[in-house]
Structures are given as structure tokens and as C-alpha cells.
Amino acid sequence: LEQDTFQLTVGQYVHQFYPGVNTTTFGVNGPYLGPTLLMHRGDTARLKVINELPQVTSMHWHGMHVPGDMDGGPQREVQPGADWDVKFQVDNPAGTYWYHPHPHMLTASQATKGIAGMIIVRDAEEEALDLPRAYGVDDFPVVVQDRRFLANGSMPTAPYGDSVLVNGTPHAYLDCPAQVVRLRLLNGANARVFDLGFENGTEMHVITGDGGLLNAPVTTERLRLSNGERYEVLLDLSGLEGDSLLLMSFGSELPQTVPGSNNLVWESSALNGIDFPVLRIRVTAPTPEPVTVLPTTLSAAAPWEEALSVRTRTKILTGNGMVGMGMFMINGQMFDIDVINDTMQLGSVEIWNISNNSNMAHPMHIHGVSFFVLDRNGVPPPLWEQGAKDVVLVDAGETVRLIMRFGHPTAGWPYMYHCHNLLHEDNMMMLQFIVEEMTVGTPEQLAAAPISFHPNPTAGIVVFQSTDPLKEVTLHDMSGRLLIRIDLLGSTQGSLDLDHLPPGPYLARITGKGSSTVRIIMRE
């Protein structure tokens, strides 16, 4: 769907995944899964979620940078027979995002039954590249799930399934033209991690992570996709008309700590620890105006400088259990809808250290932001993982460092961070945070601050003063790009000239002896 207002009706259906076998499902505007929503950065998205289910639901816009009141977490319930009007500015770069239910203790069951759909965001940077983007022609959604079907056709909520579905279809195939094509991969499974690659070793050229374009395509024969993660890959099928390729998941290559391996202690499945087919690609004739050349560069997006971080938080994952059950905690805490676990300042940059002391890998998701993976146990992540993300798989015994900026306020409704194994999430491996707007300019506050800035907001010149000697001041835009650097040489005061900069927020960092202070400066 590409329109001004999206109407998403969530309902109960009877659907046949296999001929003659009826299965009760939940779907969005149809029996299983929902429409792909096409949005453009800078536009205003308007959505109406209508609940025709016999139970409460909610809808989360996974990966989208939206205020807390529009995020659709477990607090934002939509009762049976009710609806929810959603409105937000599309603030994400071009990429693949998705929507799914998020009611507490019902997320896994509703997602299992079929409530989910993709969101594709386009922007000027992506549109300037020669990439496949004809939806359903050379640009394809690929939602990968596993589901368990009982003899009576029912589809229970389970950590693992024995049937693989792609876009809701078992034994799926896809007709692709003999040219460069684009696959938008999404792991929509409850718990299984897919280790994707082609049976014949065909290379995939990764162009995005969860949150937008990489700097350049990354060529690989394997791509590990954990729950909620997305990657866009290009395949060069030029000259292969009439051939077919088989996309596989190489479960035999998964570590014992990763759901989907052959770990015999956990729940069993016929697919665990084996290599199994996911999707057959049948190569057809090229289109009249094919993309035939792989790009060499994509985007200049980069992580924020670590020096901009105002705080480092440590999140320790603990507990033991099964893939579908157990008691797993974050910093010794479990979800309580009445407890706010963290408070952040709007516009601030933070580093999170996530250490996994539990017995299995957890795909960790943070609402409302994109982050960059700085390192895994001190080692830089693989190239395809160096773009913006919102889900990261943290293996047992591993510490992953992330950097992120909180760009939207809570607006009265907390954001979540949690394990995206949906059964762990429902079992309360989830905490809440709020993002508070910073007050930037009352004379009383400025006078009381150890380092004062005035006027703030400013029409051009902002003056700063400290009681202690200062070394330097730097000014950055909100993406972390350095704009101004001034050596202060022990002075206790100085000024920044923002007259040449466009209106908006900026980050000023003042460094003294053994300490530093970061403030948001508003240019009017």
C-alpha cells in the first residue's frame, strides 16, 4: 500500500496453508500477514489500526523512529471492537522495517497466527542509486518463518516449527528476472535463527542492515538472520534465465548456543541442526529496463563518535532455560508495566554494553532508535553488521557494545527494550525506558549549572562559562559530525558562532581537566 492513510484491520480467519487443511489464523487485511506499507522519508504517515479480533492487541512499528505515544508497545492496547489512530513523521532513512503486535503475553501467539507486515521507506539518497526498486518485479519482500502444524490443521504457539513459510507460503518459490534483483529478508520466526545461503554458493551482496544503507555492498555466502532482523541483499542473476537457485538455512553451522542448532537439551524440531531449503528462485527473462551492474558505494552514514556519549550503560542478561520458556532477566529485572527502568535525555548519545551471562543467544531489540554495533568482545563486527541496526544477536558469553542517540521523546508512553525471541519477551525479558526533553535556556538553570551556556536557544552566538579551566569545546550536528573545534588553553569562558548553521539542535562538548560536559544547543 502507498497512500495517505493506511487502514489496517486485524481479524480472525480460516486459511489453508496446505490443500484441504483448515487453519485458524489472525491477519491484517487478509488471512495471514499484512500488506507492505510504502513510505517516503519526510512524509507524514497516518494509520488506523482496527481490532476485529476477539482479544486485545497492539501494533508496533518495528525500527521506526517515532515518539513513544505512537510506538505501539504493550501499554498501547487496542481493545476488541476499538481502533487506534496513528500519525507520525517518517524520520527513517530508506530501508526495510516491519510492523507486528506487541500486547504483553500475547505477542508470540498473535504473531504466530499471522499478524505482521513489512514497511519499506524510500528517500532521496536511495532513489539516486541504480538499485532494483520495482516492487514485486525486481524488488521482493522475503518474510521467513517456521511454524508447527498439528494433524487437525491447528498452528500452536511454539518456539520451533517443522514447516518453513516464506511470505506465508510453504515450499515457496519466487520467479526473478535474469538481472540484478533485491531481496528484503526478514526473520519473522518466534525463536529460530536462520543461517542463510545458497546451495550452490551463489554470492549475496548485502546493501542494508535493519536501519538503512551500508557504506558499500558487502559480499558474502552466509548471512545469519536472528529474530526481527532485516537485511537487503542483491543477487546478480544476469545470464541465468531458465536456471533455479535454492536459498537454504544452514542449521548445521549454528553454534550450540543459538536457537535452531542441534542442542539436544532444548525443545526438539525436525529442522534443528540440519540444512534445509527456504526458498527456490526460478530465473525468468529479464525486464525491459534491467539493473545489470552492482553498485560500488551506497551511503556515507557513520556511527556517532564515542566521545559524544554522555553515559555508558551496562545491561547484563542472566538466567537459564529453554528456547520457549525459562526465567531470563536484564540486570536482574523482569518486566513490570508500572516500573520505568531507565531515563534518557532527548538528543543524548549513549553507549550500551550488553553482556550475556545466560545459557543461550538473545536477539536484543531497542525501540525508538537505531544503533551501531561498535564491537563484539572487543572485535569489530562483520562488515554487513556495521550499518544502523535495531536488533543485535548477543551470544552466550559475549559482550556487545552499541552506540545510539535518543531522538524522539517518550510523549507519555515508555519505549521498550527486550529479547526478540517472542516467547522470552512474553515471559518478561523486557524493560522500559523514557526519553525526557531537555530544558535548554531558563536563566535559573543556566546560573545553577557548573558550565553555563547563554543564550540557549540562540540566534547565532552562544557564550559559555565555567568555574574551572577548560581545554577545548567542540560542536557537532546530531549525527555526530564535527562542525567546530576550539582550543581553550585553560580559559574559563568562550563563545561558539552558530550564525552560519541552519536552525535546529546541536551538541556542544566542553572538555576540562579529567571531565567533559555535553549540552544540546538550539539554533533558532
What spans do the regions from the language model cover?
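Histidine-centered copper-binding motifs that mark active-site loops
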Residues: 1-234, 255, 264-320, 392, ...
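Short coil/turn motif common to extracellular beta-sandwich-like domains
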Residues: 40-44, 177-180, 346-349, 456-463
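A glycine-anchored, Pro-Gly-centered beta-turn/N-cap motif
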Residues: 95, 179, 348, 413, ...
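Short, surface-exposed ligand- or partner-binding patches at beta-edge/loop junctions that are enriched
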Residues: 97-102, 238-254, 409-421
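Active/binding-pocket-proximal capping segment
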Residues: 200-211, 357-387, 422-423, 435-437
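Edge beta-strands of extracellular beta-sandwich domains
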Residues: 257-261, 430-433, 516-523
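C-terminal substrate/ligand-recognition segments
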Residues: 314-373, 390-412
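C-terminal outer-membrane/trafficking sorting elements
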Residues: 443-524
